[in-house]
Amino acid sequence: FKVATKVTDLLDAAGIAYDVYDNIKPNPTIENVTSGVAACKAAGAEAIVAVGGGSAIDTSKAIATIMTNPEFGDVRSLEGVAPTKHPCLPIIAVSTTSGTAAEVTINYVITDAQKNRKMVCVDPKDIPVVAFVDPDMMSSMPKGLTAATGMDALTHAIEGYITAGAWELSDMFHLKAIEIISRSLRGAVDNTPEGREGMALGQYVAGMGFSNVGLGIVHSMAHPLGALYDTPHGIANAIILPTVMEYNAEATGEKYRDIAKAMGVEGTENMSQEEYRKAAVDAVKQLSKDVGIPDDLKEIVKREDIPFLAQSAY
């Protein structure tokens, strides 16, 4: 709440009335949204100030969308590309984590706890009208959360760079994001000012890219882990990313050379295709290890759940 107080103090000083809604889980649920809509109506809110990471901002997007499009009051109806007619209630996003880039993207994710699945919702009308990306607001994140959200941002950048819809403009965003994140995440985990500032920028740049082209199977497999086991999204992404990179390598042309170079690997111009592809994957594994991410799913996944997880990811 200390971080949120920085915002509420400003509202108090300006004489702006507000209510606080904080019933939000790390993997926000349908119930979090519906109770938030009720709170928003009760307050007569004209705007939402979303203070937090992806969970808070995603929940705010769903609430704000339903507020101006009441025919979508059933949260499940928002899944996919919902044909909403009106812009959502104005959202001012104040990011406190450096990973999701939810403050600049058109999508949000809500968990259907009854069905143990995550719903990806896409709506260009839900982008916040103002986004504050201030590394000082992110400086209170503990090391584990910094690492997890940072690897989430790297996953966004790498998946966005190799996705089928990638093109010149998105490539520009994603390669720069990979470079910034790779040089900044270790420092951010150690809470250095340079690391925090770099991650604030890097995750934002990645969001500007993938919001235009989409992501890949890392996310399709990570979402069921969050829905079934409440696994932190960034942890799931980080563990799965190297394996998916190996799986996708044959379809990526020379892009892994670019990824390896952006991650600081030297001599990529003299490497064979096999060498630079391995170098890119190894660089991701090393960064993940350096920031303390587990390297497998053994402590998370139950073997009997694998068929359900596979079907959910399809």
Language model feature labels by segment:
Residues 107-213:
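Carboxylate- and glycine-rich phosphate/diphosphate-binding segment that chelates Mg2+/Mn2+
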Residues 1-47, 297:
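ATP/NTP phosphate-donor binding region
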Residues 99, 204-237:
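Glycine-rich phosphate/pyrophosphate-binding beta-alpha loops
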Residues 228-305:
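Gly/Pro-rich interdomain helix-loop hinge
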Residues 31-136:
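Glycine/threonine-rich beta-strand-loop-alpha-helix active-site module
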Residues 304-314:
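Short, amphipathic C-terminal "tail helix"
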Residues 1-8, 175, 253, 281, ...:
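Short, surface-exposed alpha-helical segments at coil->helix boundaries
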